Amino acid sequence: MTNVSVPTEKEPRVVLSARGLRRDFGGFTAVRDVDLDVHHAQVHALIGPNGAGKTTVFNLLTKFLQPSAGTITLLGTDITRTPPDKVARMGLVRSFQISAVFPHLTVLDNVRVALQRPNGLAHQFWRPLSALDTLNGHAEDLLASVGLTKERDHVAADLSYGRKRVLEIATTLALDPKVLLLDEPMAGMGQEDVSVIAELIREVAKTRAVLMVEHNLSVVADICHHVTVLQRGEILAEGDYETVSRDPRVRTAYMGTEDA
């Protein structure tokens, strides 16, 4: 009898990778030997107790800090020494970088402003009408994709906190990121807003990679494909949520006891 192998689903491609990442501050090592692979069309969570090094890792990946050792690769290109503005143009975008939510502009105008750079209009004084029509069309499409069409003419300052976060994500998406980094996107939200943002992140990740720091473990369990747990600047555990949540080391790190 001939053995027939059953094809397995192809592993999503790695779009952002770190190897041996370390960051020293004087005699203190904040991040040590971190290896990380972020895959296209997946949501990857970076979790851990306070002081675990999550924000430092984000700052290293987005080049706001230079690593003391290790390498970072984006879409196959070494970006270890690349400045943050160039990294953003290459497709690695962190939400606060584009916090172009101007409170006195309308929702639509906020998105139009954010879209000017990727559409080549940021530094053009005279613009053909066709270019503006294209810009407006892209802005309307982007608002529709995040569910903000009804609020298109609302002034940003009048939006609820949750809707402002949606608008912030929309302005970030205007740069067409290949990898989107979100730093605690659910912070300060009520449950209704949390559900909306979680579903938006799930949709966004269908066409790009998402790496997020998040303390809401219910959200992590619901939408994340892969979880990396940090403790004292080192990787403690990784895998899917079910795997890491059962790890006694993770329980100890979060709860102080393996029996928690």
Give, region by region, the residue ranges found by the protein language model:
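Glycine-rich phosphate-binding loops of nucleotide-dependent enzymes
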Residues: T2-A260
